Amino acid sequence: MFKPSFTNLTPHSIWVTIHPDFLDDRGIEYPASGQVARVAANRAEGPLCGPHRMVQQSFGAVEGLPEPVEGTVYIVSALVLSALAGSRPDVVAPDTGPDAIRENGQIKAVRGFVC
């Protein structure tokens, strides 16, 4: 069985639980590597919306993502994964959908990854 190495390119630890119902010690923690993959954001002053200032934002290239390394899977944010549009099969994002484990509204663990 192929066992890849995971490198977390987000700014925070990712906990993937193994147990289907709750967070316990049977999960795997992927600590932040210290390197962060991001999507460049371009911002421009937009029109006013009533009394509120608006900013027009568009996204550009992915930054901080290493070249593929055989046997390595990179964990990135959903925004980075979306910007890659399927071009990198070695890149995944935490599955933060409705099955993620939350505490006080904050995600504490995910059950897997989105590819």
Name every feature range the model reports, one short phrase each.
Residues 1-115:
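Intrinsically disordered, low-complexity segments enriched in small/polar residues
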